[in-house]
């Protein structure tokens, strides 16, 4: 029955409204001026530390002058400078006298009650006090007349619209074929309906106020914060929406003062190779004002502020530590979050919006962060809005105002102290010990809120009813009145804007536009970003050095390949090849500037650093084009040095002419080409949104650039439909210039005169450009005849290259500035077609789903009791959890110690930890940050892969066996799942492989359905996991992670690592209460817990609490209302816990958690000597004794199904292969990307080399067309490896430790699934390339052989990619190695340098290159028995002796077996001799023979088999043995000998004759 429209309660005291009205009037009418506001507001909040109140008292009463402490010689210069600034403050007229020893007593600042030299002002000292420092610094700024902007924000009728549906359908490989049958979707109808995200918000936030934003995930908190800062990016505000900042419209404010309102996103984006100090000093320098206290230098000012923020947020110890990311080792996740917070704080913005910035922080650190915000607001007048999950009461009390959101609707806005009363008067019940923030959020959750008795039919239920109630309330009327006063005080006019402009202009550097939002000029921005680029290079110098070394190695290889090239006509092709290689390698080495994979590890990768640049542009640190220009400037010297070394090697080693003038021209063109191609790749990366887009375009572009350089396809043989590419190809102009530069003015001895016995004018050289009767050929004539090149074009080409360079640099800078924002869209679920639940609604009525309003005495809401017999209790969703199998095993651990070695020094992470987990108990594992909670969990779950673990870990008194890991469930903190699978499929996969084979599949799937009901996942059981924002949300992913482990039916216990991390309080409550019910039904559970509220904490039975260093603080029962736990701490000297205080936060506080936390008591030592600790050891003895007796009674064969895995090898292979096939099928972007790459590349090659004639150049072009097909190899490999890594990450992080299936199954499944798609790709490439190139005249036998070779080549590519990536950590590293190996394979395949021209020491490479046999088989099949018809410029034309015919004159040559053919045998002049007569003769020069076609085909399959075996071997040696903790023998031996080699080399260099230790026993230890 629908409820009546809710009305505000009447007849009750309305004191809250009177207080609110009084407060509003006081704030608006008696508000102090900005200057007074800075110095008169005092920290009156109850949660502020007592020291702040004492400091304020000290300020009011004044204090006596004292002798100043001497500054430490180690103090940083900027701190001494700041101190000297403070010493000149005239806040008190008195000056202390001079002491007897001549030292002057400095003036004391009575404003903050500190003296110069006091360590409370030194951020490098532990005594540093941020509150005193902030008041002192603000006072100094005031005395110097330095202004800073202060502004509030008012929003009226704020409505934000987005596009997107609540549900989408998953695309598959066949989706493009089905699209024509869905015309509605094809035309876009209904695909992106307009969606209201925020509905008609109103509010005013005065300067210096803190606003807490509360709401469940998806309620619009992030959108609200973005709207306040004007960073909607794709979302739209309604025209009626008004947002202004003290009278300045948002449009004007964001245009001129962008950095004055900043938004801190939930995710962190930083350059991982920068240190914390460099990151924060950069932020401080970018926002350093032009006018600083008493002329402090920019460097001193920015460094000091960075140090202050590092001290405030507990980062001082990380100054020289890399920030890091998921791939680069650096600071911890919590510290990285604090770096983001400090970066925002250094922006100096008067309006800051923080989106869940306390995520990943423990409660003590979160409280410290909030206190710092409060100080910034009180002292600096900063207006701050913070969306926060799981806020403690102490955090809530710091805020001034709160806004509550419910499904995008505003249901409250006002002072924090009246919010709870507002909802209680509405009719909602707040349970004891529930924090106010949790209560306010819980009223928006139908499953959690509790109605007071008598209010069941009066309280609002839906979001619309809550909103209606709010708009009719007296609080809303007062708010609207306050907004009217705000607008009257700050009308929309230019007055306040001019004040903001004036203050902003005071902070701007010289030569900065007055209306620019930036504080520093463009040259200063470029300089700052350039310095940062070099810092990043230095931070990742190993990668930079490795890249440069690989380039130099390639130069050595290519140069040596053409070493000692003859200076004859036989060297023409080699000269063209080496110049082609040189210009190509120089030009394409910059392609790495695209492939950063969004990791920001490369300082020159635009796409990788885009999220960081977008953030910094929004903070008004710098223009995007300034960062782009800085990347160019920083890169030029590095490219110059690399180009110099590279080109010196390849030029002089490759046999090019040793002329200074020609070398410098060569170097000039190659260097300009490097810069031009770099500009092109940068532009391509900046113009695209994603890395795959950029790489796809780059692949096609590179193919076009290579083919139309002029070497692989000569200009005269280019077809008109693609010849235009030649004229826009920068490499083509460089190639022409280098080739004519090399041969200009030179004559080359003829190597093949026709006939060799000719004299006078009766012979000719068989090369283009030859003149009859001359034994040498002009280089200029050769290039003009062969390529239509001219030396006169050389400087013209330089001008064209410089034009290309300038054009693409300009476009790059423009695109970098314009192509920054990314569209925002609403979150949605993704379903497979035909599997959308019938009752699914985009925004369903949760009230109906919850079954009405809960009552205070509702059993579903009361904390569950710890009774193992409650088998029929219901989970939150109403379904039973009685399907949990009964458990009797007890897991114990005693004196567990974990030691690792870091940089050669031992470090103890866990120190003698003991405990146990019984069936039916829920045990919490807590501790301060860095205490080793996850480390202990990994150690107990047998998931560590390094270090030494000692101690006893037993199950029923027995040591752990090989089945332990598959009998336990481990819910990891990271929700790792395959993005293409559905929820039900993920659960079934776990059940299939981890439940014993004795259980039928039907029973397994029935149990999966029970798990789905237990976790209330029915509504999204057929939803695809997807990615965040496009798939399951955070809570749903966490439920799936738990469900996957439950589906395995863990027989022993369930481990959980931070199951509530990143969730809101209501979602956390759901998870923990579900764990409680699992424990009540007999499941043993051990869980680390993050920021638990008092109510959550009460759900646990026992607690294991750790201090830093992995030392035990407490292990034992928690007790009712935490009495047992609190009694222990209070008995041993801790202050009593307050009645309303959260016990979890209480414990963290007393042990000294948080950045500035300290404890006077050594709690681990107290525990070690306590009676409770001795009782733990006695209980462990008793458990072990009892279980040992039980074991003896049951014998030693309790294990019914021993073994590492639950299912046999064949079952594993079937399940895993099926899942990988599903993943590929449901990833059409990957499959179609692969197929389109092959199709477009093959068609482009085919029509570029369309039906080449039978001339010598035509045959060479046909061979090049086959060669160009092999260049697809690298792009294919780069596509395959990331897919392999995705599967491997999931396997190694979650599925292998759980013993779901074998690593051999993982490898075989991935190899098998790639093969069908590679076969299809081979068929497509065969049809697209060989028909356009050779026509349909080839016999069916030859066409079949070509098809077989194409299929084989693509299968080889997939197995090669898997071999390379198998043992390497990431796709980037493997990609670099694969590219190098591919370069060697194509270099030595006999096409670019004939095998007989290879130096002797490189000939073996021609034989081991797999491409040799692929090219050989394809070329032999295509060109066998093809007649050669020389073009006019290829003929040797000469006159026979007088009276002789051409046939008579050449009879001796023909009898000697010459391969050529005479075209006019009876002529007596102008004999035309073609050096070749058949394609087999042409191929013979490359040692390609028709008779070897099947041999080559067999060798190709041998390489494929080798790749498969090498994949297995490398994975085992590098990753399996490493993960098992056993030493890798081969790597150890290599490392040992390398280390001894280094010792011997050092001895040789220093002149000490030390013998290299080679004792057998030393090496034997390794084996």
From Swiss-Prot:
Main localization, broad class: membrane
Topology of this chain in the membrane: Multi-pass membrane protein
Expression induction or repression: Expression is induced upon exposure to griseofulvin and itraconazole.
Region named Disordered: 1-37, 1172-1202
Residues carrying sugar: 149, 157, 356, 819, 895, 912, 1253
Chemical reaction(s) catalysed: voriconazole(in) + ATP + H2O = voriconazole(out) + ADP + phosphate + H(+); fluconazole(in) + ATP + H2O = fluconazole(out) + ADP + phosphate + H(+); (R)-miconazole(in) + ATP + H2O = (R)-miconazole(out) + ADP + phosphate + H(+); (S)-miconazole(in) + ATP + H2O = (S)-miconazole(out) + ADP + phosphate + H(+)
Keyword GTP-binding: no
Similarity comment: Belongs to the ABC transporter superfamily. ABCG family. PDR (TC 3.A.1.205) subfamily.
Function according to Swiss-Prot or TrEMBL: Pleiotropic ABC efflux transporter that may be involved in the modulation susceptibility to a wide range of unrelated cytotoxic compounds.
Protein name: ABC multidrug transporter MDR1
């Amino acid at each position: 029955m629908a409820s009546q429209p809710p009305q505000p309660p009447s007849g009750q005291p309305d004191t809250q409204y009177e207080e609110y009205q009084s407060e509003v009037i006081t704030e608006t009418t008696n508000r102090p001026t900005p200057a007074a506001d800075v110095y008169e507001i005092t920290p009156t909040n109850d949660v502020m530390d007592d020291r702040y109140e004492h400091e304020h008292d000290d300020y009011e009463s004044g204090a006596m002058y004292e002798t100043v402490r001497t500054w430490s010689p180690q103090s940083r210069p900027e701190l001494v400078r700041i101190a000297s600034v403070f010493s000149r403050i005239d806040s008190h007229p008195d000056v202390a006298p001079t002491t007897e020893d001549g030292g002057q007593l400095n003036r004391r600042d009575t404003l903050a009650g500190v003296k110069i030299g006091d360590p409370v002002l030194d951020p490098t000292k532990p005594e540093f006090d941020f509150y005193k420092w902030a008041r002192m610094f603000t006072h100094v700024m005031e005395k110097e007349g330095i202004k800073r902007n202060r502004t509030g924000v008012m929003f009226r009728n704020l409505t934000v619209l987005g596009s997107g549906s609540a549900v989408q359908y998953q695309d598959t490989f066949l989706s493009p074929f089905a699209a024509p049958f869905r015309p509605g979707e094809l035309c876009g109808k209904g695909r992106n309906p307009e969606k209201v995200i925020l509905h008609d918000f109103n509010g005013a936030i005065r300067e210096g106020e803190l606003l807490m934003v509360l709401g469940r995930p998806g309620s619009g908190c992030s959108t609200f914060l973005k709207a306040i800062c004007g960073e909607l990016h794709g979302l739209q505000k309604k025209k009626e929406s008004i947002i202004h900042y003290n009278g300045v419209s948002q449009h004007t404010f964001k245009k001129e003062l962008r950095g004055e309102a900043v938004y801190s996103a939930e995710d962190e984006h930083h350059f991982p190779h920068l240190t914390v100090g460099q990151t924060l000093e950069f932020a401080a320098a970018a926002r350093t004002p032009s006018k600083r206290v008493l002329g402090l230098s920019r460097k001193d000012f920015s460094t000091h502020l960075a140090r202050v923020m590092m001290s405030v947020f507990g980062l001082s110890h990380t100054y020289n530590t890399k920030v890091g990311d998921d791939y680069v080792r650096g600071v911890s996740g919590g510290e990285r979050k604090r770096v983001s917070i400090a970066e925002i704080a250094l922006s100096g913005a008067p309006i800051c919006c923080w989106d869940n910035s306390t995520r990943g922080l423990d409660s003590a650190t979160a409280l410290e962060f909030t206190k710092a915000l409060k100080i910034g607001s009180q002292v600096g007048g900063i207006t701050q809005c913070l969306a926060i999950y799981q806020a403690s009461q102490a955090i809530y009390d710091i805020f001034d105002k709160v806004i509550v959101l419910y499904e995008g609707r505003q249901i409250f806005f006002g002072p924090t102290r009246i919010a709870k009363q507002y909802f209680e008067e509405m009719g909602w019940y707040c349970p004891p010990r529930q924090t106010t923030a949790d209560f306010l959020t819980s009223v928006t959750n139908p499953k959690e809120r509790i109605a007071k008795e008598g209010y069941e039919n009066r309280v609002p239920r839906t979001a619309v009813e809550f909103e209606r109630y709010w708009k009719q309330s007296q609080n809303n009327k007062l708010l609207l009145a306050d907004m009217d006063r705000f607008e009257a005080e700050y009308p929309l006019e230019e007055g306040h804007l001019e004040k903001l402009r004036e203050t902003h202009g005071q902070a701007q550097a010289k030569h900065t536009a007055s209306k620019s939002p930036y504080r520093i000029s463009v040259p200063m921005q470029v300089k700052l970003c350039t310095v940062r680029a070099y810092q990043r290079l230095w931070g990742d110098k190993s990668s930079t050095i490795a890249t440069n070394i690989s380039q130099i190695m390639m130069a050595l290889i290519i140069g040596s390949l053409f070493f000692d090239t003859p200076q004859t006509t036989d060297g023409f092709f080699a000269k063209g090849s080496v110049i082609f290689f040189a210009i190509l390698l120089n030009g394409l080495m910059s392609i790495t500037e695209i492939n950063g994979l969004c990791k920001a590890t490369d300082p020159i990768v635009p796409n990788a650093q885009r999220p960081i640049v977008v953030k910094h542009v929004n903070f008004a640190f710098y223009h995007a084009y300034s960062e782009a220009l800085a990347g160019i400037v920083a890169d030029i010297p590095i490219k110059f040095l690399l180009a110099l070394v590279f080109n010196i090697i390849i030029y002089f080693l490759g046999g090019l002419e040793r002329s200074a003038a020609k070398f410098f021209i060569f170097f000039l063109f190659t260097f300009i080409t490097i810069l031009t191609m770099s500009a092109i790749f940068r532009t391509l990366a900046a113009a695209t949104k994603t890395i795959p887009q950029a790489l796809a375009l780059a692949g096609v572009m590179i193919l076009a650039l290579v083919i139309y350089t002029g070497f692989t396809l000569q200009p005269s043989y280019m077809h008109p439909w693609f010849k235009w590419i030649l004229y826009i190809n920068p490499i083509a102009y460089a190639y022409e210039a280098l080739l004519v530069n090399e041969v200009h003015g030179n004559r080359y001895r003829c190597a093949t005169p026709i006939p060799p016995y000719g004299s006078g004018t009766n012979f000719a050289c068989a090369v283009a450009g030859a003149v009859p009767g001359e034994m040498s050929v002009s280089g200029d004539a050769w290039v003009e005849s062969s390529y239509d090149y001219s030396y006169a074009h050389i400087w013209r080409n330089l001008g064209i290259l410089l034009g290309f360079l300038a054009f693409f640099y300009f476009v790059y800078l423009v695109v970098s500035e314009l192509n920054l924002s990314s569209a925002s869209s609403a979150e949605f679920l993704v379903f497979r077609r035909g599997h959308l639940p019938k009752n699914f609604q985009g925004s369903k009525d949760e009230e109906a789903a919850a079954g009405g309003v809960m009552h205070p005495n509702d059993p579903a809401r009361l904390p569950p009791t710890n009774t193992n017999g409650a088998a029929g209790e219901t989970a939150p969703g109403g379904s039973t959890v009685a399907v949990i199998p009964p458990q009797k095993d007890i897991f114990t651990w005693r004196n567990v110690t974990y030691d690792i070695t870091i940089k050669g020094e031992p470090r103890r992470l866990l120190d003698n930890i003991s405990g146990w987990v019984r069936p039916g108990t829920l045990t919490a594992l807590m501790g301060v940050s860095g205490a080793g909670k996850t480390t202990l969990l990994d150690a107990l779950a047998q998931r560590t892969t390094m270090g030494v673990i000692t101690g006893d870990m037993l199950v029923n008194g027995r040591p752990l066996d090989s089945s332990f890991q598959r009998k336990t469930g481990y819910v990891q903190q990271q929700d790792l799942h395959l993005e293409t699978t559905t929820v039900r499929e993920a659960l079934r996969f776990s059940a299939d492989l981890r439940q014993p084979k004795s259980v039928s599949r039907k029973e397994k799937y029935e149990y999966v359905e029970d798990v789905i009901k237990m976790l209330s996942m029915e509504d999204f059981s057929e939803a695809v996991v997807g990615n965040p924002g496009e798939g399951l949300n955070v809570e749903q992913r966490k439920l799936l992670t738990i469900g996957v482990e439950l589906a395995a039916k863990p027989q022993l216990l369930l481990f959980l690592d931070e199951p509530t991390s990143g969730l809101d309080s209501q979602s956390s409550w759901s998870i923990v209460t579900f764990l409680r019910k699992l424990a009540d039904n007999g499941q043993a559970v051990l869980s680390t817990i993050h920021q638990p509220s008092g109510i959550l904490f009460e759900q646990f039975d026992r607690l294991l609490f750790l201090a830093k260093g992995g030392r035990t603080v407490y292990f034992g029962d928690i007790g009712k209302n935490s009495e047992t736990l609190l009694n222990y701490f209070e008995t041993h000297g801790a202050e009593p816990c307050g009645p309303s205080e959260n016990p979890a936060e209480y414990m963290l506080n007393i042990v000294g958690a948080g950045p500035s936390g300290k404890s006077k008591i050594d709690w681990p030592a107290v525990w070690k000597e306590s009676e409770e600790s001795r009782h733990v050891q006695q209980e462990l003895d008793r458990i072990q004794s009892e279980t040992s007796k039980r074991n003896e009674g049951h014998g030693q064969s309790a294990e019914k199904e021993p073994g590492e895995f639950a299912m046999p090898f064949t079952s594993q292979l079937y399940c895993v292969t099926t899942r990988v096939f599903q993943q590929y099928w449901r990833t059409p972007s990957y499959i179609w990307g692969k197929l389109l790459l092959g199709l477009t590349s093959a068609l482009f090659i085919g029509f570029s080399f369309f039906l080449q004639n039978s001339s010598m150049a035509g045959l060479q072009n046909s061979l090049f067309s086959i060669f160009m097909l092999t260049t697809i190899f690298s792009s294919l490999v780069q596509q395959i490896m990331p897919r392999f890594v995705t599967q491997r990450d999931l396997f190694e992080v979650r599925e292998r430790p759980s013993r779901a299936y074998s690593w051999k199954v993982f490898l075989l499944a991935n190899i098998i699934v790639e093969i069908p798609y590679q076969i299809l790709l081979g068929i497509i490439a065969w049809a697209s390339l060989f028909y356009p190139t050779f026509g349909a005249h080839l016999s069916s036998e030859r066409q079949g052989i070509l098809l077989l070779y194409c299929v084989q080549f693509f299968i080889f590519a997939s197995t090669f990619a898997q071999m390379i990536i198998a043992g390497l950590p990431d796709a980037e590293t493997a990609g670099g190695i694969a590219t190098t190996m591919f370069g060697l394979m194509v270099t030595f395949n006999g096409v670019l340098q004939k095998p007989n021209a290879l130096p002797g020491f490189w000939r073996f490479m021609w034989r081991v290159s797999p491409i040799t046999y692929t090219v050989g088989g394809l070329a032999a099949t295509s060109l066998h028995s093809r007649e050669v018809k020389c073009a006019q410029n290829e003929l040797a034309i000469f006159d026979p002796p007088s009276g002789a015919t051409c046939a008579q004159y050449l009879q001796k040559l023909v009898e000697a077996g010459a391969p050529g053919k005479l075209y006019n045998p009876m002529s007596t002049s102008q004999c035309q001799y073609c050096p070749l007569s058949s394609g087999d003769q042409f191929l013979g020069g490359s040692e390609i023979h028709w008779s070897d076609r099947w041999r080559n085909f067999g060798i190709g399959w041998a390489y494929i088999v080798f790749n498969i075996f090498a994949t297995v071997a490398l994975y085992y040696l590098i990753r399996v043995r490493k993960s098992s903790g056993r030493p890798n023998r081969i790597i150890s031996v290599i490392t040992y000998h390398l280390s001894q080699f280094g010792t011997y080399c050092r001895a040789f260099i220093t002149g000490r004759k030390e013998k290299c230790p080679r004792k057998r026993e030393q090496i034997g230890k390794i084996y």
